[in-house]
C-alpha cells in the first residue's frame, strides 16, 4: 500500500466523546435489562428501510430510508415528527448531536460515470438544511461527530474533518485506499479502518497519521478503545488488540469468518462474526471466555446492557439476547418477518430500536 503525505487544510482542537453512545442499553437512572420481558411499543412500517443504522439522541430516532428520505420518529411512541429529502441516496449512516443531524448522500456526476457526494447538517427540530458541502466522492460507512467536528472517510481514499457549525473542511488526508467503515473518536484521535485492511490512528486536531496497523482483510466495523488498548475486527477473520498510544500488536484471536463488529466491555471484548458465532474474549490476552452459535450471520454490532447483549442475526425472524456471563440465550424478540437488514440495533432512553426489511420497531420492558 502506498501512502501519501497528509494534506492539512486547517487544524482545530476538540474534546473526546464517549465511545458508542448508542450501543449500551444501560441508562443512568433508567436501566434497561435485556433479559427481562420486552414488548413491542411501536412500529414504523416502510418498504424503504435500509442497511444504514439509524441515529438517535435518546428522544428522537433518525431513520435513513432507501429512497433518500430521512424520517424523524418520536422515540417514545414512534410518531413522525418530520421528514426531509436528503438530496440523493444515502451513502453512510447518519450521526446526531445536540444541534443537528448529519447525513451523507451520493449522486451521479455530470458524466454519469462517476459518483459525487454531499454532506448536510439538518436541524433536529425541523429537518431544514443548515448547511451543505459537495464532495468529489461519496462518504462511506458511517459518520462520527465530536465536540466541534464531523469525521468521515470517502470512497476516494480521503479522510475528512468538517466544522460541524459551518461545514468548512478542517483537514483532509489523501490515502491510496478506500474507506467504508465506522470511524471512532477517542483520546484525541480518530480511528479509521480501510478496505485494504489498515487501521489508521489520526491526530484529531490536524489529521496527522500517528500510527497504522495492517491486517489481511477490510476493516468495516466499529473500533473500540478502552484501557489503553484498541480493539477491532477484520474481514481476515481475526479480532485484534493493539496499544492505543503506539499501535503495537498485543494479541489477535481467530474466528471462522469476517469479524463485523467488536464492543469493549468491563469483562471482555464481544465480537460478532459472519461465521454465525458471537465471541467473548479476555481483554488482556484475547483468550476465549465463551462463544455461542446463533441461527444466522451477525452483520452488525450488538446492543449491550449489564445483563446481556442483543444480536440481530440475518435470515431469522427474531433478535436474540445472550448472557454476558456464559453466552447462554436469555431472551428473544419476535420480529414478525425474516430479517435481512444489516443495520445495527440502537437504544433510546428506555427502548431498543430494531430495523428490519419492512419496519423500524421499538421494544421496551413490560409494564
Model-derived segments and their meaning:
Residues 74, 123, 163, 203, ...:
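Structural recognition of the beta-propeller blade-terminating site
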Residues 9-19:
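Bacterial N-terminal signal peptides
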Residues 46-69, 90-120, 133-160, 173-200, ...:
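Repeat-blade elements of multi-bladed beta-propeller folds
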Residues 1-4:
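N-terminal secretory signal peptides that target proteins for export/translocation
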Residues 26-50, 62, 79-86, 118-120, ...:
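Aromatic (tryptophan-biased) beta-strands that constitute blades/sheets of beta-rich domains
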Residues 23-26, 236:
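C-terminal region of N-terminal signal peptides and the immediate post-cleavage residues
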